[in-house]
Regions:
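Outer-envelope beta-barrel architecture signal
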Residues: 28-34, 86-90, 127-133
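Surface-exposed strand-loop-strand hairpins of Gram-negative outer-membrane beta-barrel proteins
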Residues: 1-15, 51-61
Length: 187
């Protein structure tokens, strides 16, 4: 029996990696934590997506009808600190992730992505309730280039808009894109 999958994510995902985590109690009120890791990945039978982080940037992806596999690597680290003093509790966390993926057959995408994030939160104990506020910030950037090296020529590359639509103005030989976003949230 088959398994449901999105064509843009492929139908087989093979990963190998290592993760390191740490949690240290500095005192009765202070904690620090962190993690770092590396992951190597191969997605097979990917169609209509030549980008990394599809779930984050969709539906604005570059795609073609040929598709194939995508190989990639990801490195990340993050950490944080939390403290409690009387009725107050607060914490800060931050992290960075760098990824790249590619294919060594036409069409040949080469994507790099960086993802930086910070969050800060504070809370106050009021009887059996806790009132809290938090803010976070994220800076994400992705650069994508597609090349064709075979003598057979190239296929059309589409800049997808979602719901099966593409941006006709850039269809054809436009093979580079850049996704950049920053933002924050307060709660």
């Amino acid at each position: 029996k088959g398994k449901a999958s999105l064509k843009q994510e492929g139908d087989k995902d093979t990963r190998i990696g290592v993760d390191v985590n740490s949690f240290v109690i500095l005192s009765e009120r202070d904690r620090v934590f962190g993690s770092a890791g590396y992951r190597s990945e191969k997605q097979e039978n990917v169609l209509w997506n030549e980008n990394i982080d599809w779930k984050l940037i969709a539906p604005y992806v570059t795609g073609d009808s040929i598709g194939g596999f995508l190989k990639g690597e990801t490195y990340y680290f993050n950490g944080g600190y939390a403290s409690e003093s009387g009725s107050w509790i607060w914490g800060i966390t931050g992290g960075y992730r760098a990824s790249h993926n590619y294919r060594d057959k036409d069409p040949r995408p080469r994507n790099t992505a960086s993802d930086l994030s910070f969050a800060l939160g504070a809370g106050y104990r009021l009887g059996t309730y806790r009132l809290g506020v938090s803010a976070d910030f994220r800076l994400y950037q992705q650069k994508s280039e597609i090349s064709f090296l075979a003598d057979k020529g190239s296929t059309s590359v589409y800049h997808m808009l979602g719901l099966g639509m593409d941006y006709v103005r850039f269809a054809g030989k436009q093979t580079g894109t850049k996704h950049q976003a920053s933002g924050g949230e307060e709660a």
